[in-house]
């Protein structure tokens, strides 16, 4: 068991103990400090006097040393699984994964195996000092099970804290690409709404009135358009969009694009119809519309991630190419 300590100065007087420890010990997050204090791992040391402190709200006193014991991490509950991973970047602090479609990030009822966490536990065996006292990877964001692309994960407590701070401050550049039914008007802009659970279907999210949900901001730009809806309507049949997240709400891009009438091709939850509505004829037309109709997942890909490394200060930028199914659909749509 490791013991860490910090000496309180005059400017620290009156600060809550959990806040003081998290600010003076880099490896501790505020929530982790609070848990350790409540579990009796924090002590107040003044000369020969040592006293256990179990209240996170205890005000610190100048001249007193505060220590905290760091228990050994307990084994993770999810089982490690030897699942191949596409890893475009890894160092001692972080690992960046290009997640395939069909892989959930976290284990959950009905999906205890085959998740990204299971795969990372196997990949990082013996190299996870513990996040929150548990031997597990530090997941700070997630992408939907059937969305592909880039995800960054912390391997250590300090990196987890640093990444969490970056996401909280919106200092992460997250770019997605999407194939949509028809195209947005205007061709680029910002969607800013509140998002909450749908009152009609608790498994879905929905745009709600201001103040009734969580604030969500999506910036979008149309990169390509394909075909025409009908002979009488000149609007494109489909489009290839770039979307940049300023916030990270559940299903945010899917909900926002469906809200403006441009649902993702293949989206089984927010798409009203399978495939696309288009006019045309010939082999190229048939192939494009057939691929769109047969796509069994939302046409959404986390294409890139940019951030300042929380431990080294280096600029990190990782890209993932469009997966085969979406690349094939994009090529086919280009022939409309």
Show where each model-derived region lies:
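The conserved catalytic core of RNA pseudouridine synthases
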Residues: 133-165, 173, 196-262, 293, ...
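Generic secondary-structure boundary signal with a strong preference for alpha-helix termini
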Residues: 75, 114, 161, 223-224, ...
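Short regulatory "switch" loops immediately downstream of catalytic or recognition motifs
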Residues: 40-49, 125-126, 222-230, 270-281
């Amino acid at each position: 068991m490791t013991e860490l300590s910090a000496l309180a100065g005059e400017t620290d007087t009156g600060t809550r103990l959990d806040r003081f420890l998290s600010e003076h010990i880099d490896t501790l997050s505020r929530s982790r400090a609070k848990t350790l204090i409540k579990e009796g791992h924090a002590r107040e040391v003044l000369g020969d006097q040592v006293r256990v402190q179990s209240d996170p709200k205890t005000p610190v006193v100048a001249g007193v040393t505060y220590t905290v014991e760091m228990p050994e991490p307990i084994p993770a509950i999810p089982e490690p699984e030897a699942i191949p991973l596409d890893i475009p970047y890894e160092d001692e602090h972080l690992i960046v994964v290009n997640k395939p479609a069909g892989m959930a990030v976290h284990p959950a009822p009905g999906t205890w195996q085959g998740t990204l966490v299971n795969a990372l536990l196997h990949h990082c065996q013996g190299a996870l000092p513990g996040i929150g006292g548990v031997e597990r990877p530090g997941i700070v964001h997630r992408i939907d099970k059937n969305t592909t692309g880039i995800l960054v994960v912390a391997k250590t407590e300090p990196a987890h804290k640093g990444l969490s701070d970056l996401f909280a401050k919106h200092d992460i550049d997250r770019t997605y690409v999407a194939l949509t039914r028809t195209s947005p008007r205007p061709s680029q802009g910002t969607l800013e709404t509140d998002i909450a659970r749908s009152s009609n279907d608790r498994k879905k999210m929905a745009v709600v009135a201001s103040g009734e949900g969580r604030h969500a901001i999506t910036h979008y730009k149309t990169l390509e358009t394909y075909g025409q809806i009908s002979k009488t309507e000149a609007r494109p049949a489909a489009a290839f969009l770039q979307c940049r997240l300023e916030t990270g709400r559940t299903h945010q891009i899917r909900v926002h694009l469906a809200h403006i009438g441009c649902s993702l091709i293949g989206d089984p939850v927010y798409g009203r119809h399978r495939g696309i509505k288009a006019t045309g004829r010939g082999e190229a037309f048939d192939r494009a519309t057939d691929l769109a109709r047969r796509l069994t997942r939302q046409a959404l890909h986390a294409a890139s991630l940019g951030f300042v490394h929380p431990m080294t200060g280096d600029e990190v930028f990782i890209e993932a190419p469009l997966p085969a199914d979406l690349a094939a659909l994009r090529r086919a749509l280009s022939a409309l």
